[in-house]
Amino acid sequence: DHLVPTARELAFNLRDFGSDGAYGHYFNGPSTFDISNDEFVVLELERLKAMPDLFNVVVMVVINAVTQELYLSARDRPRFVLCDEAAQFMTREEGQDLSRLAEAISQGYRRARKYRGSFGIILQSMNDLLLFGGTGQVILENAATRFLLQGSTYDKAVENKILDYSGFVLDLLKSVRNNKPNYSE
């Protein structure tokens, strides 16, 4: 008897994802989402920002796929997971649950090497790591490599203790210039 109200609530919450629901065409039928043969995966979620219900579900699907591939598959080849413009997804918007994404990034940075994998994020500024809360600290402590391009906020990143550069190294970093349309320094 106690399961009936729970089942009704579950059915109500899933109605938009059923065959006739607003998002049904994304989830009904054979799945075409397969990253098992991909060595390089970019999580590009920009189009979903305006649809928080769909955003949360797709993030769960992607996290599940990445987890399966990275942690549970054979370790015979390396894997690389890159989250582009990651900071925009760490800024909560109406209805978005970012805890799963933050946890996946955090666990990825902590555990991926053990499974011949690596995790990366692309940010506009090192200071964007402050948006990540505790996950930002995990990223700082576990990122083996950083690619730092031209930026105007490196002094602020030093003040925020995100970067520990000073003197010549900081001056050298601040001297990096973009040389469009060619490759940069």
PLM regions and their residue ranges:
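P-loop NTPase motor domains
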Residues: 1-117, 178
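Conserved ATP-driven motor cores of ASCE-family P-loop NTPases powering translocation/secretion/packaging/pilus
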Residues: 93, 97-102, 106-185
